[in-house]
UniProtKB/Swiss-Prot annotation:
PROSITE patterns, per database record: MPN, UPF0758
Residues the entry annotates as binding Zn(2+): 174, 176, 187
Descriptive protein name: UPF0758 protein M28_Spy0816
Superkingdom of source: Bacteria
Family note: Belongs to the UPF0758 family.
InterPro entries (UniProt xref): MPN, RadC_JAB, RuvA_2-like, UPF0758, UPF0758_CS, UPF0758_N
Alphabetized CDD domains for the sequence: MPN_DUF2466
Keywords: Hydrolase, Metal-binding, Metalloprotease, Protease, Zinc
MPN domain: residues covered: 103-225
Length: 226
């Protein structure tokens, strides 16, 4: 369980943040600022302490759905939405800051970024990283989000943005919501198809990576397709 210490003698979190800076606040205090108010049974600091005590780590917030958040005592629809919005914004800030201007060196670096971004998604997402002639990522594009009737994407959707932005190479990534990273026969067929289509246009397909929350599969590292 997440260990929480509650100190009734502390000043209110907003005042402490103004005086000491956000980095000086505890997780309990930062969450209390987001919640703003408590409920009939608990002061806002007690409520934030209660919520954190039900988590093994802060990362559990990212994995929880709106419905799961609302089931926690004192969390209504509005507060649950605000927490999810905050978590998503932080994820996007970290993803942008970490990789958009970096040169790609290994499949591991790409996989680690995309495991954090896609590992907890309940639907299949296909994302493409487009690179320039200096191997720098200049665009990250979500090509599609899977539905019951559709799996993965057509090469033309991926290559449209490559041609539009004069990409030299690209990396394809998609997640397996089941957590099983082993490629299916459809994954192999798709990889062959997109690699061949890229070659026809003089674009290099550097890799196709499948990710889950904790692991990844790189076709470049583990298959004979590259």
């Amino acid at each position: 369980m997440y260990s929480i210490k509650c100190d009734d003698n502390k000043a209110m979190p907003r005042e402490r943040l103004m005086r000491l800076g956000a980095e000086s606040l505890s997780n309990q205090e930062l969450l209390a600022i987001l919640l703003r108010t408590g409920n009939k049974e608990k002061h806002v600091l007690e409520l934030s302490s209660y919520l954190l005590s039900h988590l093994d780590s802060l990362a559990d917030f990212k994995k929880m759905s709106l419905q799961e958040l609302q089931h926690l005592a004192g969390i209504g629809k509005v507060k649950a939405i605000e927490i999810k919005a905050m978590i998503e914004l932080v994820s996007r800030i970290l993803a942008t800051d970490k990789t958009l201007t970096d040169s790609v060196l290994t499949s591991v670096q790409v996989a680690e970024k995309m495991m954090a971004a896609l590992g907890d998604k309940k639907q299949e997402h296909l994302v493409v990283l487009y690179l320039d002639n200096q191997n720098r990522i200049f665009e990250e594009k979500t090509i599609f989000i899977g539905t019951v009737r559709r799996s993965l994407a057509e090469p033309r959707e991926i290559l449209y943005y490559a041609c539009k932005n004069m990409a030299t190479s690209l990396i394809v990534i998609h997640n397996h919501p089941s957590g099983n990273i082993e490629p299916s026969s459809n994954d192999y067929c798709f990889t062959e198809k997109i690699k061949r289509s890229c070659e026809d246009l003089g674009i290099i397909c550097l890799d196709h990576i499948i990710v889950s929350y904790k692991d990844y599969y790189s076709f470049r590292e583990k298959s004979t397709l590259f």
